[in-house]
Amino acid sequence: MTINTTRIETMLAERGLTKAAYAKRCGISRQSISTIVRRGTCEPKTAGKLAAGLGVPVAEIIEERS
């Protein structure tokens, strides 16, 4: 899945979360968070964890394909 990394980083800033704290909330490693943000993609299961860590639906963090 293509992830809207700008949206994720904005949400992290709004919530005052570091990537390390976010990773802990998501149940994945900080290194994985960094890789996902750098590449802008992840598996659907991981996208679910990322969204849950922010308390939002997956639709809010994925890029829409045209």
Feature locations, PLM:
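Residues in the helix-turn-helix
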Residues: 21, 32, 60
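Short, basic-rich loop-to-helix N-cap that marks the start of a DNA-contacting helix
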Residues: 39-52
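Short C-terminal boundary/hinge segments that cap the last helix of small helical domains
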Residues: 55-66
